[in-house]
Amino acid sequence: MATKGGTVKAASGFNAMEDAQTLRKAMKGLGTDEDAIISVLAYRNTAQRQEIRTAYKSTIGRDLIDDLKSELSGNFEQVIVGMMTPTVLYDVQELRRAMKGAGTDEGCLIEILASRTPEEIRRISQTYQQQYGRSLEDDIRSDTSFMFQRVLVSLSAGGRDEGNYLDDALVRQDAQDLYEAGEKKWGTDEVKFLTVLCSRNRNHLLHVFDEYKRISQKDIEQSIKSETSGSFEDALLAIVKCMRNKSAYFAEKLYKSMKGLGTDDNTLIRVMVSRAEIDMLDIRAHFKRLYGKSLYSFIKGDTSGDYRKVLLVLCGGDD
């Protein structure tokens, strides 16, 4: 996949001490200068933001995130604090938020676990344990059930084959197994779907999807929709979409977070913050292709104030 990359790049002529002073000035005394905060943090990459946090602590003797939390509020605060949080820790905190308290944010669990690389997932698991003194797998088990639980536990192990190796015989076997597990029989053997979709490498799976279509005359997505349901179906579809095209998957997540009445701010914020440095330009291109309007125009119409301002900077421009 040729990628255009992210919208947030390392700022040239970067000076962490200077930025720290600008931020302190923006928050000192009465009122807060939100524009100054955006002008610094939205135009620095994650590594630079961490340097600013260190400089802030060493020159001012206060924690930057604590100060931002006490000065800001609502969705704008959530974006800024998200941007200030190291990448892996941000995912960890989002997973914890998705499972804490009453109710579960299944969409968040699926999105993170289906889209991150096996290596990222292993780092997420380790960091989760360090942060909360409990294992990610145990929390998933206590918060979910049935096949949905099994697919998340499987993804959270980070055991997917990371190679590119292709075995034609296994491709045919997997496609046949999936066909026999679903379309060909009454009832569905969900475990077979789980085994193939959670453990094989991307190159292998793309060939399996092609072979599956050849023998069943259907896209694997169509079969998943007719053979499974609920959160388990959502998880399997997310895996397939991420394997086919991760940026298109995130474009769809953003579209669904804003279309219709109301906004799913948690999803909108998480995707904008976590993809800004990785593939936001690709996400924008897919958004325009899929929905005929720019991501920029959607954000503009769906948000307001400083929250809108900072998201538009992360979006990086209109298409």
Curated annotation (Swiss-Prot):
The modification N6-acetyllysine is found at residues 213, 293, 300. InterPro entries: Annexin, Annexin_repeat, Annexin_repeat_CS, Annexin_sf, ANX4. The keyword Acetylation applies. One of its GO terms (cellular component) is vesicle membrane. Annexin repeats lie at residues 14-85, 86-157, 169-241, 245-316. The modification Phosphothreonine is found at residue 7. The modification N-acetylalanine is found at residue 2. Keywords: Acetylation, Annexin, Calcium, Calcium/phospholipid-binding, Cytoplasmic vesicle, Membrane, Phosphoprotein, Repeat. GO terms for molecular function: calcium ion binding; calcium-dependent phospholipid binding; calcium-dependent protein binding; identical protein binding; NF-kappaB binding; phosphatidylserine binding; phospholipase inhibitor activity; transcription regulator inhibitor activity. The modification Phosphoserine is found at residue 12. Seems to bind one calcium ion with high affinity. Belongs to the annexin family. This is Annexin A4. It comes from Homo sapiens.
